[in-house]
Amino acid sequence: MEKVSLYACLILNLSLLVIFPYSKASQADKLNEFILSRKSQNPPKTLSWEEGDALKTLFSSAAYVAPPQEELRLADKIVTLPGQPYGVNFDQYSGYVTVDPETGRELFYYFVESPCNSSTKPLVLWLNGGPGCSSLGYGAFQELGPFRVNSDGKTLYRNPYAWNEVANVLFLESPAGIGFSYSNTTSDYDKSGDKSTAKDSYVFLINWLERFPQYKTRDFYISGESYAGHYVPQLASTILHNNKLYKNTIINLKGISLGNAWIDDATSLKGLYDNLWTHALNSDQTHELIEKYCDFTKQNYSAICTNAMNMSMIEKGKIDSFNIYAPLCHDSTLKNGSTGYVSNDLDPCSDYYGTAYLNRPEVQKALHAKPTNWSHCSDSINLNWKDSPITILPTIKYLIDNGIKLWIYSGDTDAVGVTISRYPINTLKLPIDSTWRPWYSGKEIGGYVVGYKGLTFVTVRGAGHLVPSWQPERALTLISSFLYGILPASVSPSN
């Protein structure tokens, strides 16, 4: 039977997706693009993050640490953001941290402290995925940050379900070339990959903690979504290794959480197509062909498998694959005099409002950012990605074995949804500590939860790829439970 290489097959799928273009490339699109276009290693390397020879340099020398940075911290404090609402009762900071002084590589951050008891609450680092997408544009201004952008592209409104209600939250644009992060050596943009991103993010953290020394001993958590299913575990692993090597730069890592995360190619690809079928986006006939002829653990697919996967994309049609029940953006023009509010019906044109806001000169000045043609995602970073393990499961196992709390959550209306998390988790064969049950947020079932030894899996009802955008209250309930170390409530508070 004729065989088609994995790479050729994925390119064919990618060309089919162009038939149904999105109005604007988003984080979810970038993940899809990356999955369909990347070259897996041949033979695929399944070594854990800790075992690869190429990673020796990651742990072989102390990180670059700048001198004391109190003056920089004071300079990074934001006086006010243009268009922000009245009554802001928390401190916010933003600016650059140098991660490589020789090449002039600097990463941009935005930090919001909690409005109450910030001196005792934990520190949470948020990372968006892609690869190549901004944690400022998505995480901070569209998902879990304290503000969202009105449809006028000029003003902000408060998010009552912001995660800084329960933690001090740090948003990082990484790697260089994304958002406001940059390098004076442009060839750096062609070298981005999992290894360099983990290393730069670690160096960023060490230096950021020098700038904010009051957080050095604070409980520290990392959370992220999408391709951050790679970033977050890899950064956590890097921290653990360096904590053992260098006692003067200890980071008090307690746990990680992964949302709608891509962590294992073979099981996640199967989960993707199963999810499309169970949500009635694919026909029985196409799904049966994929089930029979597609072995996602192999490098080469048969022509029948390739054609079936292509047909799956055609059958799905022009919908938002990452919230399959949501409308598309049909009018991206800015609206004057609009005032938004946070609900479970996210405006599908929100990307455009954020882009307009973050490109305003007065906004970039207030954020202490260099003048930049800012965008949510970088095409060059995504398409030039240098290294990406086909599985992160060994790294996840390493973190569990080292006592790091680990939650994985999935919105159930995302095509990259529940099955792409369940299938990889099942391969770990962890004992169940707490059986599958519903959990509540307010008076409604927020989703379902199952507890394993060392890992908790949570679904979020009615949420797409960006869980805090589509179900902000449920996302806050979830992250609060994660930080407090308890499972979400099993009964409604009204009962």
From Swiss-Prot:
Recorded GO CC terms: apoplast; extracellular space
Pfam families: Peptidase_S10 (PF00450)
Protein's recorded name: Serine carboxypeptidase 1
Domain of life (superkingdom): Eukaryota
EC code(s) of this entry: 3.4.16.-
Family affiliation: Belongs to the peptidase S10 family.
Biological process terms in GO annotation: arbuscular mycorrhizal association; proteolysis; response to symbiotic fungus
Family annotation (PROSITE patterns): CARBOXYPEPT_SER_HIS, CARBOXYPEPT_SER_SER
The keyword Transcription regulation belongs to this UniProt entry's keyword annotation: no
Glycosylation, residue list: 117, 184, 300, 310, 336, 373
Subunit structure, as described in the record: Interacts with KPI106 and KPI111.
Provenance organism: Medicago truncatula (Barrel medic)
Keywords recorded for this protein, A-Z: Apoplast, Carboxypeptidase, Disulfide bond, Glycoprotein, Hydrolase, Protease, Secreted, Signal
